[in-house]
């Protein structure tokens, strides 16, 4: 089975070819990070225009690397939700054009499910499990049962963790994206430099706006007093607090649901402190932590193709998986609100 995956939900244009749910024949990505750097974040209109400019070229590169043609493709998987609506529409429209021209069925994929299924490309995942999804736009704890039903049991009430990293990095003058820089700075700083109060929110939900505000207020106060501090110390205090919260809530969810596996997913799953600390704390409770390789943490089309593979595999009737040419992009859609796959 050959699935062509298409991903364009934010600022990466990606097309991949995945065979039989395990073999990545190609996974090409055209990133826009350098373009958006000067703005300190993703500009939706620019992102959409870049997708239009790049998507045909990325397709050609992916097909060439996979050594196939469109005639060899059995299914087209495309991200349709959630994301920047203009960016989503580029990928969805491109998928519909290919489907119409070559009579290939379209399988719509939820972007967050794609991130979680990235783990299935590299691991034998034991279900049920808990997944911590952490990215620039999302922070969720999701329970996945034996039948691949996705149940959202926790979410951020304000900023996503990746968004908070970018905002703190902007205050510290570290550039965009902020996550990788803060990750490196953590090991050079003192995580106990600034005591940050952890927000009290219900059960498995998160709140990061107060932590971000504490960093901003401290920086402003120091500037008003003409006092200096080590940026590494403030970055370490911020990241240490955030990772503590992520680990504690995720582990509590895993214990309550009595699962033996935790999956990390999303761009922030590449964070070295989060990986090591969650793995260490989970091991104390007899729980295994798995996460994708670095190349599969960020937005990519291989994970979208993989999600489509399991959508087909678990469907009673494969035609229930298909979308027509009236498929549209959806900017906001909780993973629990989509039909189970």
UniProtKB/Swiss-Prot annotation:
State how the cofactor is bound: Binds 1 Fe(2+) ion per subunit.
**Which HAMAP family does this chain map to?**
TsaD
* Gene3D superfamilies xrefs: 3.30.420.40
Q: Which cofactor does it need?
A: Fe(2+)
What is the name listed in the Swiss-Prot or TrEMBL entry for this protein? Answer: tRNA N6-adenosine threonylcarbamoyltransferase
Do the record's keywords include DNA-binding? Answer: no
Family annotation (InterPro entries): ATPase_NBD (IPR043129), Gcp-like_dom (IPR000905), KAE1/TsaD (IPR017861), TsaD (IPR022450)
UniProt superkingdom: Bacteria
Q: Where in the cell is it found?
A: Cytoplasm
Q: Where does Fe cation bind?
A: 111, 115, 299
Metal-binding found in the keyword field:
yes
Which biological process annotations from GO are given for this protein?
tRNA threonylcarbamoyladenosine modification
What the entry lists under Pfam families is as follows: TsaD (PF00814)
Question: Where is the organism placed in the taxonomic lineage, from the top?
Answer: Bacteria, Fusobacteriati, Fusobacteriota, Fusobacteriia, Fusobacteriales
Per the record, the gene is tsaD
Sequence similarity? Belongs to the KAE1 / TsaD family.
Q: Where does substrate bind?
A: 133-137, 166, 179, 183, 271
Tell me, what is one Gene Ontology molecular-function annotation carried by this entry? Answer: N(6)-L-threonylcarbamoyladenine synthase activity
